[in-house]
């Protein structure tokens, strides 16, 4: 079986929504995308409003009959970003296949998987740079830390 050609996207200082929508489009077109530095992507807006929004989602929405049933909200930066991409894909088989073509890592690619992405071609998402913002922003790492994520030193977990 032929190895897919991977596209490498560095999410550091990128606006999360703009980046995720472009990644979703590329994945639907059949591109294989690996995203690194997910924790450094930014969400535009005032820090206290953004943190309050995500903490409210995390703590207040529960199933009254069985709180363990969900909905489940991700507090790890890689799964948080992957979930946002999933929300931008169609809810059918085509969207599920597109999501399989997207790999997200918290920081850099782990040494074990570097050979898989050795020939990855770097790509740039237009109009998604943080410099475009004239207002305040908060990183995904800050949001996830506020939602309860504690980074394990020495281990880079990813999907």
Where are these predicted regions, by residue range?
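Ribosome-associated RNA-binding proteins
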Residues: 1-159
């Amino acid at each position: 079986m032929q190895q897919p050609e991977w596209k490498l996207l560095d999410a550091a200082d990128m606006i999360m929504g703009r980046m995720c929508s472009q990644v979703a489009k590329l994945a639907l077109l059949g591109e294989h995308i690996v995203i690194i530095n997910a924790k450094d992507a930014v969400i535009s807006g005032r820090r206290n409003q953004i943190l309050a929004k995500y903490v409210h989602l995390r703590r207040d929405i529960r199933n009254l009959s069985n709180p363990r049933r969900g909905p489940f909200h991700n507090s790890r930066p890689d799964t948080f970003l992957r979930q946002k991409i999933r929300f931008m894909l169609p809810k059918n088989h085509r969207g599920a296949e597109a999501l399989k073509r997207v790999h997200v890592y918290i920081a850099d690619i782990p040494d074990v998987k570097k050979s898989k992405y050795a020939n990855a071609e770097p790509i740039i998402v237009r109009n998604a740079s943080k410099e475009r913002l004239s207002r305040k922003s908060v990183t995904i790492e800050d949001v996830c830390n506020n939602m309860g994520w504690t980074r394990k030193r020495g281990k880079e977990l990813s999907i």
